[in-house]
Amino acid sequence: MVADSDDPDVLALQAALAGEHAAVYAYAAIAGRGDAGSSVVELANEAYAAHRAGRDRLVRTIAARGEAPVPTEPGYALPFALEGPGAARRLARLVEDRCGVLHAAVVAAASGQERALGAQELVECALRGVQWGADATAFPGVKESR
């Protein structure tokens, strides 16, 4: 990720945007490898659309600040092979968790409408994660220390 700004708000927004780019890729991979009409493919298509919309909101928000939004990478490496619906669900949970952490960072760094955007995206990530089988947590996007 290349960001020209050293503003913490912009850096958090750019990191969240980079995460959304990766999420769009991951959900395209999940949907492309699943059985047409299956619940996994249907959920993946819904999540794909949601992350594209989130990505587009972040692009507009960053551009409105006069910054160049980070572009998508030419490709992404999946963390493991997508062999079956169990692996697809595991990847989806990982995507939502990682994006949730990035949006929580926006909530922490930003204010006003940008903070509200981060909070909205964080909630959506948490809800999608639960749809994919993740446990509900008291503070989504915040890693609990034990």
Task: Indicate where each model-derived feature is located.
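All-alpha RGS (Regulator of G-protein Signaling) helical domain and cognate RGS-like helical scaffolds
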Residues: 1-146
